[in-house]
């Protein structure tokens, strides 16, 4: 597991700015001398940086059937990078990390994010790693939307995109389901307007209902 602090400001679509942020990521396979064999994996809504192999808890990565020696995303050939997006709860800067200014969890004060914000953050990591072009950007569902956004925002940085189970926009039904899930979590008595982490609480009943 790798941890990189991005020190350049990231201006978000909502108008707010992250003056700096951290990104957690894992790598598989070796980066070649020309740095031209890098593949980016973009995770779905509840995914994270752990894409292949077993983590410290013995859990297989979500792409374990596809990433590895001799597998479709062959790590004998490719250098695979899988990150946890900002705003997630798996280590990258987000509601579950500490906002150093007040010294508390970001919680509900963390800015709203859009797909383009994740892609811009990923591009900043790409620059830190001195990778000029992705051989491929791959993602499913919400990750597929990120792969699509890469092709729109940075077409010269992507040789190919693999977009799985993703569309250009959500249907009204999908938006409605997500809103029901959101309200289920917010209705939990432990949600506390999103500040539950600073109070040592977990809205587990609302989350169970939402999922």
Residue ranges of model-derived segments:
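Catalytic-loop region of hydrolases
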Residues: 1-38, 55
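Structured loop/turn residues at beta-strand edges in well-structured enzyme cores
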Residues: 16-19, 34, 76, 129-132, ...
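N-terminal cap/lid subdomain of alpha/beta-hydrolase-fold enzymes
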Residues: 26, 30-99
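Residue-level signal for well-ordered alpha-helical scaffold segments within enzymatic catalytic domains
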Residues: 65, 85, 124-128, 149
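A short alpha->loop->secondary-structure connector
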Residues: 99-104, 157-158
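Conserved acidic catalytic loop of the alpha/beta-hydrolase fold
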Residues: 102-109, 116-136, 145
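Conserved hydrolase catalytic core segment
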Residues: 132-176
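Alpha/beta-hydrolase-fold enzymes
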Residues: 157-158, 163-211
């Amino acid at each position: 597991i790798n941890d990189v602090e991005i020190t350049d400001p990231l201006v978000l679509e909502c108008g707010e700015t992250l003056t700096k942020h951290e990104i957690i990521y894992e790598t598989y396979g070796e980066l070649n001398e020309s740095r031209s064999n890098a593949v980016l994996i973009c995770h779905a809504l509840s995914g994270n940086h752990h894409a292949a192999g077993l983590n410290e808890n013995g859990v297989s990565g979500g792409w374990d059937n596809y990433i590895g020696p001799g597998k479709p995303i062959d790590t004998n050939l490719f250098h695979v990078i899988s990150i946890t997006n900002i705003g997630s709860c798996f280590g990258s800067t987000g509601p579950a990390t500490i906002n150093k200014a007040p010294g508390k969890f970001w919680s509900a004060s963390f800015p709203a994010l859009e797909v383009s914000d994740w892609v811009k953050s990923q591009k900043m990591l790409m620059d830190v790693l001195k990778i000029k072009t992705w051989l491929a950007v791959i993602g499913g569902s919400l990750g597929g939307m990120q792969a699509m956004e890469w092709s729109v925002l940075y077409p010269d940085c992507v040789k190919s995109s693999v977009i799985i189970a993703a569309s250009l926009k959500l249907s009204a039904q999908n938006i409605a389901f997500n809103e029901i899930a959101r309200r289920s979590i917010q209705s939990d008595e432990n949600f506390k307007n999103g500040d539950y982490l600073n109070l040592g609480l977990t809205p587990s009943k609302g989350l169970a209902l939402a999922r």
